[in-house]
Amino acid sequence: MKKKIKIFIDGACLGNPGPGGYGVIICGKKLYKEISNGYYLTTNNRMEIMAAIIALESLHDMYNIIINTDSKYLKNGITKWIKVWKNNKWKTNNNKSVKNIDLWIKLEYLSKKHFINWNWIKGHTNNIKHDRCDFLAKISAKNPNAIDKIYQKIKNF
């Protein structure tokens, strides 16, 4: 039987695009971990997806996971839209290129290693763990130390 854990994630951006960050909390029976990082130039949606990627990359075993996010973009993207995008050769229903393809591909790959229930929660409603993720994401955005290379390449193209 797979171990059960809960993951709380949030992304933030000071301006969109602008400096951004993510916050992650992973908690289980004998596990509690906080992860955060900030980027010089990125978008809020990229930070939301990145938070999920970083959370899943940090796991070394297979888990039964509940991922809590306040991003409908992330939840709908990974649970509904990605199937349509892939069938449309990474185009939206409006025939536009899907944004953040690099992150969606990585997230889908990592998601297949676990059983994940993607849970949308309303942000800023006194959920202690989610509020902590929000705090970590904002602090990281204010103190960036990393470059979102793919985003900057697209931005400078």
Curated annotation (Swiss-Prot):
* Localization (cell): Cytoplasm
Q: Which cofactor does it need?
A: Mg(2+)
Cofactor binding notes: Binds 1 Mg(2+) ion per subunit. May bind a second metal ion at a regulatory site, or after substrate binding.
Asked if Cytoplasm is a keyword of the record, the answer is yes
**GO cellular component entries:** cytoplasm
May I ask which residue range the UniProt record assigns to the signal sequence? Answer: none
Binding of Mg(2+) 1 occurs at: 10, 48, 70
Instruction: Identify the Gene3D superfamilies for this entry.
Output: Ribonuclease H-like superfamily/Ribonuclease H (3.30.420.10)
Q: Biological process GO terms, please?
A: DNA replication, removal of RNA primer
Provide the RNase H type-1 domain boundaries: 1-142
**One Pfam family hit:** RNase_H
- What positions does the entry give for Mg(2+) 2 binding? 10, 134
Q: What keywords does the record list, in alphabetical order?
A: Cytoplasm, Endonuclease, Hydrolase, Magnesium, Metal-binding, Nuclease
Q: Which reaction(s) does the protein catalyse, per the Swiss-Prot or TrEMBL entry?
A: Endonucleolytic cleavage to 5'-phosphomonoester
- Give the multimer and partner information: Monomer.
Q: Which family does it belong to?
A: Belongs to the RNase H family.
Sum up the protein's function in the record's words.
Answer: Endonuclease that specifically degrades the RNA of RNA-DNA hybrids.
NCBIfam families on file:
PRK00203.1
Q: What is this protein called?
A: Ribonuclease H
Origin organism is Wigglesworthia glossinidia brevipalpis
Which gene name belongs to this protein?
A: rnhA
